[in-house]
Amino acid sequence: MSDKLKLLFLSASPVDEEALRSDVEIRELHQRIASSLDRKRFEVTAYFAVRTSDLQRILLDHPPNILHFSGHGGEEDGIYLEDDLGRVAPVSGEALAGLFAVFKGTLRIVFLNGCETRAMAEAFRYLVEYTIVMNRRVEDGAAIVFATAFYQALARRQTVRNAFALAVNQLRIDRLDADAPELLEGITPVEVKPAVTKARKKEPTNPGTRSLSQPVTNSRVRKMIIIQGDNNSVKG
């Protein structure tokens, strides 16, 4: 990865889903990065109460190397952003793939810290080097512990694989669900053509929850730029 890492933290908390502690997640994340000797390598930008109408603009304004989503997800729906009234507005893996394609080469890691985000990642995993997802429902506290441990290691020059392994191990240390997170490595799509023989053509074998109490307005999409250098709800 390049010397400078731009981390974009996005959170959504629809009113019709259970409230989660995204504020705690970004606070812990920032503290672990800020306490590292390598803290100046990270530039962290955070947005809360993100609506579907905000998503593309935010990425255009802040093209990230790492995109971190903190919120709800569903195996069939994708991740849950908000509509203008603060209600659930699902965004599918295919829609994210269309967005991530624009940032291919810049966007290196996608971290979807919400329930059941594994299935949707198949739509875009070939566009990024690493995708971190949850393969089932996960407790909010466990999700925060996992994310905190991952960035703590990454900020201390560990590889993505090592940072992921240490984050999973932290869940084991704390006796939390260590089987929910998955690390997916990027896939480069290749056109597979059937092998041709004299006799015949041989066909190839193809071998998450957070909520708000008030309607969302433009002013409620809050942004926080973190200056460099310085629980039992279910996430589903």
Regions found by a protein language model. Give the residues of each.
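Caspase-like cysteine protease fold
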Residues: 2, 57, 89-103, 157-230, ...
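Cytosolic/nucleoplasmic/matrix-facing N-terminal domains/tails
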Residues: 52, 66, 101, 120-121
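Active-site-proximal C-terminal subdomain of hydrolase catalytic domains
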Residues: 38, 42-45, 105-203
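Solvent-exposed polar/charged
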Residues: 60-61, 101-102, 125-126
